Amino acid sequence: MATCSIKDWQGNATGEVDLDLPVASAATASHVVYLAFKRQMVNSRQGTASTLTRGEVRGGGRKPWKQKGTGRARAGSIRSPLWRKGGVIFGPKPRDFEIKMNRKERRLALRTALQSRVEDLIVVDEFEGQLAAPKTRELVQAFERWGVDMASQSILLILRERQTNTYLSARNLPNVKVITAGNLNVRDLLATDWIVVTGPALELIKETYGAVA
């Protein structure tokens, strides 16, 4: 079980919260997380790359020159893959790259990834009321009060639900990504230096993923 301190808008500790999610065993944890990460990255591929074979390129139905007697190499079509503007040999065609993974395994990987980042996890009180209007400077100052180095570190901010002012305040910060608890994913959990989560968002995560089902 890991215990995280809760910080308010000013960076002062206001309490503690326990994070004790059922995770994979030490022997299988890295592999389960790897499979979930691989699935997410592969499934994000569009798979729409497409090329034309020699039979699909427009033209090339007539033989360019007779077979023998010209002194040139024989050719049957101007759309041969050997020719400029010809077809493509073994080029990509639209395909589905989807990798399936059991729901229980996906949830296990997500819990394991989150629990493994507990040392980089910062829990804060709900601060929607602190941003009356979109103010990037105020959000940056809050991150610094919470102990995050904004100059060189990437941040994942997890909210219970979408907050317009918070989203607009963080929109032009290249090292900050804002997601809701319902969109939690393995890649974001592993790819950032710090994870900042609001108390209500963490409770929703524990409620959703805490039980083994």
From Swiss-Prot:
Record-linked InterPro entries: Ribosomal_uL4, Ribosomal_uL4-like, Ribosomal_uL4_dom_sf
The uppermost taxa in this organism's lineage are:
Bacteria, Bacillati, Cyanobacteriota, Cyanophyceae, Gloeobacterales
Q: What is this protein called?
A: Large ribosomal subunit protein uL4
Q: Name the job this protein performs.
A: One of the primary rRNA binding proteins, this protein initially binds near the 5'-end of the 23S rRNA. It is important during the early stages of 50S assembly. It makes multiple contacts with different domains of the 23S rRNA in the assembled 50S subunit and ribosome. Forms part of the polypeptide exit tunnel.
In this chain, the stretch annotated as Disordered covers 48-72
S-S bridge residues: none
Provide the gene name from the record: rplD
Composition bias type Basic residues, residue spans: 60-71
What Gene Ontology terms for biological process does this UniProt record contain? translation
Instruction: Supply one GO molecular-function term.
Output: structural constituent of ribosome
Pfam assignment, any one:
Ribosomal_L4
Q: How does it assemble?
A: Part of the 50S ribosomal subunit.
